[in-house]
Amino acid sequence: MMENIMKKRLLSTSISTLLLGLSVMPAFADEDVTAWRLFIADHDKPVVNVIDALDGDKLATFNVKGPANLSRSESGATIFAIQGSAGVVSTIASGIAFHDHGDHADIDIDAPKLLPLELTGKKPGHFVERQGKIAQWFDGEDSAQILGESAVLKGQKNITKVNVVAPHHGVAVPYDNYAVVSIPNPDDASKRPVGARVVDLQGKKVGDDALCPGLHGSAGSGDTFALSCETGLLLITQKNAAPVIRHLPYAKTLPEGSTSTLIGGKGMQYFIGNYGPDRIILVDPTESDSFRLIQLPTRRVHFVVDPVRAKFAYVFTEDGKLNQIDVLKGEISQSVRVTDPYSMDGHWNDPRPRIAVADNKIYVTDPLKSKIIVLDATSFKKTSEISVEGQPFNIVAVGGSGKVHGEHHDHEAHHHDDHAH
């Protein structure tokens, strides 16, 4: 009888071991996976939270050295936390990476992590990344720092410093072996720059300077990068080696004013910018009638473009409404109230909502209520809220869909300890 009991135990153990082995074997069949993450910086604290955008779970909290503005790379593989008060730019690996294979893209999903590489200097300011090259500006330095995203991910501090004549509040745009840099005001470098020039990576000027009085604001869309001036936009393209700059003057039909904040369209080539406190301007650099003004119901707080639904952009206004902009029609297509009013009176850097778009959702931070409002991008209706400790302020989204080939998918990158799917 004891022999029969032992046989049953051995049989049971063997079956359990077999099932366990099957459960941990990698799935070698291709799998379509979608992953989106939100990176949120607190307004007052040196903290960056990472949240799974699809279910609201917190994935990580990173302690940095000061309150941060957040910028992401084009690839989404890296996030840059620019801490002006601390004189440092921290680098974060988003944990989501894509590999282009022509007819499809593979996706790798890992845990987000704070990288060891930091960029340091006096008063870090504007961040620009294009085609895998990063240019970080420092208002208190006479050089901009340029490096590759791949070096950041490897922890390699392979930085090229490009001279910008004098410390000033400007910008650098990286172009392979060149950069476009702002020109400081020769009479008073504390005032806005007066133009832009092309330099090689040794700081030597290439070609003629481009006048751009009151330069402030920059963005890329398609193959064109734009800089805002009091007189119009500087449009930068690169056809062969060195980039070329041309000036697009404001239309004479526009009222007096200029844009000082620009965002570039995704999927369509256009730019959207501020034009006074309660108007925005749409710029199509390919059309003869390049500029269209849109009147807002109240003063603008923040605006973004929709990278998924290319014809839309979103503007949050101080009355607590999110306004959907139809870029093709040049008008507000619909509006929805999402928060209490956030007046633009007071300090320019008071805690006010910021917007990000991830997949089919729109996310609006509500810093005074310690939460993020989630809206469905199709119905344009509020669907849920995500609680975030402190004052969630600056926000960027990273993610997308791709194929996973079995063992390359890190299922441990997102823990669900308190619930099951």
UniProtKB/Swiss-Prot annotation:
This is Zinc chaperone AztD. Residues 404-421 have a biased composition (Basic and acidic residues). Its main location: periplasm. Residues 1-29 form the signal peptide. It comes from Citrobacter koseri (strain ATCC BAA-895 / CDC 4225-83 / SGSC4696). Monomer. GO terms for cellular component: periplasmic space. The gene is aztD. SUPFAM superfamilies: Nitrous oxide reductase, N-terminal domain (SSF50974). Zn(2+) 1 binds at residues 126, 169, 216. Residues 399-421 are annotated as: Disordered. It is found in: Periplasm. GO terms for molecular function: metal ion binding. Keywords: Chaperone, Disulfide bond, Metal-binding, Periplasm, Signal, Transport, Zinc.
